[in-house]
């Protein structure tokens, strides 16, 4: 099951972001899925 926009994600262990999203780790605390466009 993939993580949707603005949900938490992890580059290394999951959950993975849904299609069209990437895992951004700039926000605190932790990583969030952001649109890749």
Swiss-Prot record:
Keyword Secreted annotated: yes
Signal peptide (from-to): none
Alphabetical UniProt keywords: Amidation, Disulfide bond, Ion channel impairing toxin, Knottin, Neurotoxin, Presynaptic neurotoxin, Secreted, Toxin, Voltage-gated sodium channel impairing toxin
InterPro entries: Beta/delta-agatoxin_fam
UniProt main location, coarse: secreted
Tissue specificity statement from the Swiss-Prot or TrEMBL entry: Expressed by the venom gland.
Database matches in Pfam families: Toxin_7
A single GO cellular-component term on record: host cell presynaptic membrane
Protein name: Mu-agatoxin-Aa1b
Subcellular location: Secreted
Note on domains (UniProt): The presence of a 'disulfide through disulfide knot' structurally defines this protein as a knottin.
An example molecular function term from Gene Ontology annotations: toxin activity
Residues with the Serine amide modification: 37
Sequence similarity: Belongs to the neurotoxin 07 (Beta/delta-agtx) family. 01 (aga-2) subfamily.
Protein task: Insecticidal neurotoxin that induces an irreversible spastic paralysis when injected into insects. Modifies presynaptic voltage-gated sodium channels (Nav), causing them to open at the normal resting potential of the nerve. This leads to spontaneous release of neurotransmitter and repetitive action potentials in motor neurons.
Top-rank taxon, per record: Eukaryota
Cysteine disulfide partners in this protein: 2-18, 9-23, 17-33, 25-31
Organism annotation: Agelenopsis aperta (North American funnel-web spider)
């Amino acid at each position: 099951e993939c993580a949707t926009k603005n949900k938490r994600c992890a580059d290394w262990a999951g959950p993975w972001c849904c299609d069209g999203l990437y895992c951004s780790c700039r926000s605190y605390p932790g990583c969030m899925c952001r649109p890749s466009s």
